[in-house]
Amino acid sequence: MTAEPNKPCQIKRDYQQLINLYPATADTDAHYLSKLSIYQQQVFEAHSQQKLLVLGQIGLGNGLELLSWWRTQANPSQRLLLKVFEPNPINAYELKSLWDQSLTLVKETPFEPHLESKQASALEFKSELCQLAQTLLNAEPTAIIGCQRLIFDDGRTTIDLHFGDIQTQLSSLSHSPMHPVQHWLILPHLLQALHHQSHWQMAKLSDDSATIATIGLSESSELSETTVNSFQACGFTVSDINELATKALGIHQPVTLINHQPDAVLLHERQVLRQQDAKAYAFNPMAAILSSATQSSIAIIGGGLASAHLALSLAERGQGAQVFCKDAELGQGASGNRQGAIYPLLTPENDELSRFFQQAFLFSRRRVQALTSATAVNQTPISHDFCGVLQTAHDERSQLRLDKIIQGQPWPSEIAYAVDAEQANAIAKINLDKPGFFYPLGGWVCPFEYADAAIQKAMQLADVSVSLNTDILAIERQADGWVLLTEKERFGPFAQLVLANGAELTQFDASNKLQISPFRGQVSHVPAQFQLSQLATVLCANGYLTPSHQGLHCLGASYVKEPEHLDFCPQEQQENLMKMHESYPNQSWLADIDMSGNNARVGVRMVTRDHFPMMGCAPDVPKILKDYAQHQLTKESRHYWQTTPAPVHQGLYILGGLGSRGLSSGPLAAECLAAQLCGEPIPLDKETLCKLNPNRMWLRKLLKGKAL
């Protein structure tokens, strides 16, 4: 059961503030709903040949248009990616309040005999929207800055919510050559708020024949002329939904939305803008896009959370994969723990690391919900409990750090909020007697069940196979792709190969120079008894303690760099216990922690110095060093590294370095790599993608003109 903060924390704005920030585009009567439906059907018909239709929407409004796009999608062979840009972040609680109080989705249209058929249709329309609205609310959109990716219907519908300054959000994204935005809808209350620079950023992200529609443009001649001229100067055609729908009703035929061939000069200016963007980030090469001829030619080495979720993200796109796991079962490495905490890593500055982990945590949480949904077909159970995570300090230094995080930002309460000692005791259901920071949407998940469920779903959706007991000892690059070798067998060639093999990530010649370190972690399993069994949330202090699952709590974990063995260690078992005593001294429930059974599990997690995971092209380190020798600390060297694609092993990719928070970061990192491989828009900004790149440690120095 999700632990919820108090309602006053969740809804900070009253209804009048909400309707001012998120106004309805028009009265939700039969007239508007009919026009909206006709217009959106026209968009889908105009782009019916697209396997993935990418649409952009400026403004969330009251959410009606978003839900209607979702509802209108009818082509079973077409996927929809809807990118919504909204300057004012909103969470699920406020969105529900807005809908409940405005009756947007439930109010009945006053009966008019001559509109009887339209009104009946409108009520049916609203009924369908209500179901989608509840599905959207269940996904828990939160009021954070940046992109939140919401995936529905096994990948058939994807909604990217980009919250924050629209110009900033638009400019932070890269053009997707294979799947650009085909059409934009701009809600009227934001027309004047868009600057000309924003128009150009929209053009950068768009197909050259992309069009724009808005509502009520013709009602203001001054606004109409100014807006249309600005968009036309960027190569767009602008249409009014009212006029499109009226024309369609009049001639009883679809109206084309591709009205003209943009001026060649304007298209060239768009291309220049894209090239400037690409040049600025040339040092961060993207994955080579899979062609239709190589649809089944991708291999993934690894049997844990990373490989499973990459297979799932690929499968949602219809892309098959072959997964190679050295163990007899999935999830036997770092993903083999009984319980793992899932919550975001926050920093006082809310920098790229903090923002990435918020996005990733929410994405992973939604994955768990989708895979365990009552409507999921042949679902594989995932033991989990979104009971919240309560972070407390364990000494003076950690208290100062936690205070900086709490006071550093006006954190959305659905992400985290401060609690006093009394509130902490009430949340935990055992006495802690100290204040903390509560993550209400967090909790714990069983990692190996999570990985297995992802693989099982992937196998339902696409041609995904798993080869167990297959220990890949070497990989070789040949003219026609990558070949995988065991002691006795040979697999391939594969056009693309992803290394997602956890602790063995650096075992191959092509990956052994990655700047990443193994850390041993021993997790203690202790019986649930007496006061301890009442624990109702995950505790994180000097170590962590989970609520009971199948009669056991998880207590951990040790942190030993470059371990010599993975055997049970009595000393680490006692250290885990002492960490709890240091964190919550003199509490009576500590006596209930019984370590006498020596029950524990040992695993290895791969950790990067900057705490970001690694996702992207495998760096060709010998070639980097060779180029460095030729461009060593000259005046031109920084420019060279800035504008030259960093050397990589073609067709080889890294997905790893998930550290101690792989449950939070792994699924989104996998989703981003799958999007790259399939040439689709990525739900991360350009700067964050650079932070994930496996070559970042070398490039960070080279871009600053420093010695390696």
Predicted regions, residues:
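Dinucleotide-binding Rossmann-like beta1-alpha1 core, especially the glycine-rich loop
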Residues: 339-426
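Helix-loop-beta segment of a Rossmann-like dinucleotide-binding subdomain
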Residues: 106, 348, 379-391, 421-461, ...
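Helical element adjacent to the flavin cofactor pocket in flavoenzyme catalytic cores
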Residues: 437-482, 486-496, 500-501
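Flavin-dependent oxidoreductases
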Residues: 355, 475-477, 485-578, 583-599
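N-terminal Rossmann-like FAD-binding beta1-loop-alpha1 element of flavoenzymes
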Residues: 296-323
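Glycine-rich FAD pyrophosphate-binding loop
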Residues: 316-336
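C-terminal catalytic lobe of FAD-dependent flavoproteins
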Residues: 590-708
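S-adenosyl-L-methionine
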Residues: 100-174
